[in-house]
Amino acid sequence: MCLIAHLVAGFALGSALKVSLWILVPAALGLHVLLDLVPHWDYGFTLRRPWWAYGDFALSAATFVVCYRYLGFTERALLTGLVSAAPDLDILLSVLPLRWRLKWFPSHWASFPHGRAGQALGILTQAGAVAVCVALLALTHPSS
């Protein structure tokens, strides 16, 4: 899934689960793997891959700032969002003009059974996942 989907899912996980960070942080990484199993569309196979990656990163960074500064997300939710999204930074690194393009997270390896779908259905799948996470956040995030 795109970086933004992993970020919002991590926010929801950190907001919903009231457990130790020792449990929550590994759970956020596990959530990343589970979301990558769901059939979805990845921009990694398009000619415009760098622009999709830059846009995804910019949208995710802006979302993080808004959630931190204006929506009052807890530190746990913010941390869990970052941990869940962090493995996708190797996707961003892979589109930069660098020699090093190692994909270090297991769900990004060619041997991983990554869920795949066409562009329209795959984007809808991710939008649906984000919508579920936003609904969960609405139920679990304390009002300001």
Residue ranges of model-derived segments:
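N-terminal membrane-targeting hydrophobic helices
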Residues: M1-S144
